[in-house]
């Protein structure tokens, strides 16, 4: 995936819904930060090639859902505002979300609902855009759903979290009537739910899409690499609450295996679709 966009799939049926992964490009993250306290010798031969500064390329996979006459967008990537990013994060080919959507004939004004798992710059940067020199909502008709606690944290960050929460991604929402804050589990429309998944942030969430006995989970920053799906103890240094992350991963991944859920992983190589299996007692990520 180094510096190159992988061809994305067509619409995928899920019961009476349709899913499509759309990409905002590629983000480069310091590989040591991605894998946290896990020693380099354990992961360096298993990951994608690093650049000369030891950065790891990761996807920016967003999800379109068509259901019940609605168009739902889960996550918006870094966006195209040339947004500053935290030190150690270099952006390559970011800001491609709208072009990727346009190739499918979907315009910003066609989006009814936007869902953010959390408000770090690489998950909500495309919520806003410069229009006629002023910050505005990218999706002018959409209602924007996210956890109330995440909104409060993003607007009152501490010294550790401040670098990831950027005011330019938040201010137009605060001034609009389109912000929908939820607490805990929340159904956005029938079959589409926001589920708490704390750890990466205290109010991080995932998104469940269920229809006709089939289920997909968009897992946000539950993991930052597919190796973390296979190895529970591998936790990113970006996680605010690593021990909480561990318990959340156990709960969600055990459920995903038991119920054969389709997983959509934002930072896996595009399109980030796959399932987690138990093979001879070990977790195995099977990318689609």
Spans of features found by a protein language model:
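Conserved beta-strand hairpin/beta-sheet module of binuclear metal-dependent hydrolase folds
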Residues: 9-104, 206-221, 225
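Active-site metal-binding loops of divalent metal-dependent hydrolases
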Residues: 24-26, 76-79, 119, 149-150, ...
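Short, P/G- and charge-enriched loop/turn segments at secondary-structure junctions
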Residues: 48-53, 132-133, 194
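Residue-level marker for buried hydrophobic side chains located in beta-strands
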Residues: 72-74, 115, 144, 216-218, ...
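Metal-dependent catalytic neighborhoods of phosphoester/phosphodiester hydrolases
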Residues: 87-90, 124-134, 275-276
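Cap/insert and terminal regions of metallo-dependent hydrolase folds
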Residues: 88-99, 212-288
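Metallo-beta-lactamase
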Residues: 92-106, 110-122, 129, 138-196, ...
């Amino acid at each position: 995936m180094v510096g190159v966009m992988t061809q994305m799939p067509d619409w995928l049926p899920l019961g009476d819904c349709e899913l499509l992964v759309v990409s905002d490009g590629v983000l480069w993250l310091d590989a040591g930060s991605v894998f946290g306290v896990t020693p380099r010798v354990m992961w360096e031969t298993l990951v994608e090639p690093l650049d000369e500064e030891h950065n790891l390329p990761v996807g920016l996979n967003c999800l379109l859902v068509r259901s019940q006459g609605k168009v739902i967008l889960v996550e918006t990537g870094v966006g195209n505002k040339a947004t500053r990013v935290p030190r150690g994060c270099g952006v390559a080919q970011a800001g491609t979300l709208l072009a990727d959507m346009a190739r499918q004939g979907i315009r910003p004004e066609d989006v009814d609902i936007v869902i953010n798992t959390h408000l770090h710059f690489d998950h909500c940067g495309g919520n806003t855009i410069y229009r006629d020199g002023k910050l505005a909502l990218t999706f002018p008709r959409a209602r924007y759903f996210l956890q109330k606690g995440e909104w409060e944290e993003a607007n009152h960050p501490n010294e550790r979290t401040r670098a990831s929460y950027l005011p330019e991604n938040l201010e137009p929402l605060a001034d609009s009537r389109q912000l929908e804050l939820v607490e805990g589990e929340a159904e956005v429309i029938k079959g589409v739910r926001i589920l708490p998944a704390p750890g990466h942030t205290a109010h991080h969430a995932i998104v469940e899409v269920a229809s006709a006995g089939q289920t997909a989970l968009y897992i946000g920053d539950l993991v930052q690499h597919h190796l973390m799906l296979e190895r529970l103890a591998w936790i990113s240094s970006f996680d605010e609450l690593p021990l909480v992350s561990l318990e959340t991963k156990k709960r969600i991944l055990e459920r995903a295996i038991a119920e054969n859920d389709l997983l959509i992983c934002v930072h896996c190589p595009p399109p980030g679709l796959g399932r987690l299996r138990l093979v001879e007692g070990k977790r195995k990520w099977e990318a689609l």
